[in-house]
């Protein structure tokens, strides 16, 4: 048997040299070269304000159903972050996923809170609501992020789909920690004149504008920003949502929560789900590379984002999306899960 192994190694070495001489990729037994061996899952930390816009819950449902994602933990931000963590925990427990879900910071760094409550918490079971702690240590969420990133250097993608209060605190408290990240992906900002109801503003960016500014100033890793000007193109009517979300038990849970949302809205936009899907399938969007500046000059414009093209910049902003491919990618995750 050792002789056979030596012969195989000699054969591989010879074919490798011949392949290189011919300008081809050499044969290999490495995992990445064997089409039957799947690439490792993408390690993910999720920071979310689940409990307000329904798309956070939709994104989390997609993430836990996506076979190519290894969700390491969840942190929550803005008002009633304990209730937001409880909502996230309802989804993870429904699929048997036992991971840390930790409430983080609530108050913006400078301005007054604009997102005080988690409206969808009304859908929490009464037994859960009665046992929620009244107080929490928000720094525990930051501790968890720091420890997880340091334990997985270069492997973790940080997905931020709420106001960036926790992310700014992470970068402030652990200088250089972003160098250990694979990348940061955000749903936030608006980077073009594409028409939306709020002009140049976007909610995640303006709720804590100083945190938004710190994110773009302090991060030392690649950032992919999926802005409102892109996500606004992806939407469904309540009737379409009710029809499509009947197909999977987890989507049925989210559908029940969405009824709170649809009392005040006539569409579901897939803001956060697009950011999540772009982690697995980056080519759902096309991008432009550069830098992002955040306006802090006055209260009316605070949080408005401006993109400047720069080939040396760390930021890639989405500039276009394929809606059909997105919805196919999104619902495929649930149909595959239903068959397994």
Give residue ranges: language-model regions:
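N-terminal export leaders
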Residues: 8-24
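N-terminal secretory signal peptides
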Residues: 1-7
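Short, well-ordered secondary-structure micro-motifs
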Residues: 112-115, 196-197, 235-238
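Conformational coupling and interaction surfaces
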Residues: 40-41, 62-65, 70, 203-210, ...
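Metal-dependent C-N hydrolase catalytic cores
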Residues: 40-44, 83-151, 313-322, 326-335
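Active-site histidine-anchored catalytic micro-motif
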Residues: 39-50, 54-86, 90, 131-231
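C-terminal segment of N-terminal export signals and the immediately downstream linker at the start
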Residues: 26-43
């Amino acid at each position: 048997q050792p002789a056979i192994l030596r012969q195989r190694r000699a054969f591989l070495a010879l074919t490798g040299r011949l392949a290189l001489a011919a300008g081809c990729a050499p044969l290999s037994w490495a995992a990445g070269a064997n089409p039957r061996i799947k690439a490792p899952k993408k390690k993910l930390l999720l920071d979310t304000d689940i409990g307000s816009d329904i798309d956070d819950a939709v994104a989390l449902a997609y993430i836990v159903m996506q076979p190519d994602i290894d969700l390491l933990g969840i942190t929550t931000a803005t008002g009633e972050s304990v209730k937001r963590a409880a909502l996230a925990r309802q989804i993870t427990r429904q699929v048997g996923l036992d991971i840390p879900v930790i409430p983080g910071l609530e108050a913006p760094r400078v301005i007054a809170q604009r997102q005080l409550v988690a409206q969808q918490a009304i859908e929490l079971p009464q037994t859960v609501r009665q046992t929620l702690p009244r107080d929490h240590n928000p720094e525990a969420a930051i501790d968890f992020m720091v420890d997880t990133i340091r334990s997985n250097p270069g492997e973790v993608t940080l997905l931020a789909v709420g106001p960036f209060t926790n992310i700014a605190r992470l970068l402030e408290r652990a200088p250089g920690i972003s160098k250990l990240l694979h990348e940061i992906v955000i749903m936030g900002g608006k980077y073009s004149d594409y028409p939306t109801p709020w002009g140049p503003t976007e909610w995640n960016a303006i709720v804590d504008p100083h945190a938004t500014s710190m994110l773009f100033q302090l991060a030392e890793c690649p950032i992919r920003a999926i802005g409102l000007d892109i996500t606004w193109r992806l939407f469904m009517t309540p009737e379409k949502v009710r029809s499509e979300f009947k197909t999977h038990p987890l989507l049925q849970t989210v559908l029940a929560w969405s009824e709170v949302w649809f009392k005040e809205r006539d569409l579901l936009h897939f803001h956060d789900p697009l950011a999540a899907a772009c982690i697995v399938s980056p080519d759902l969007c096309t991008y432009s590379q550069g830098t992002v500046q955040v306006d802090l000059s006055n209260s009316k414009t605070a949080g408005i984002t401006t993109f400047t093209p720069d080939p040396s910049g760390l930021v890639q902003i989405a500039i276009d999306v394929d809606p059909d491919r997105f919805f196919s990618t999104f619902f495929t995750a649930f149909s595959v899960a239903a068959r397994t």
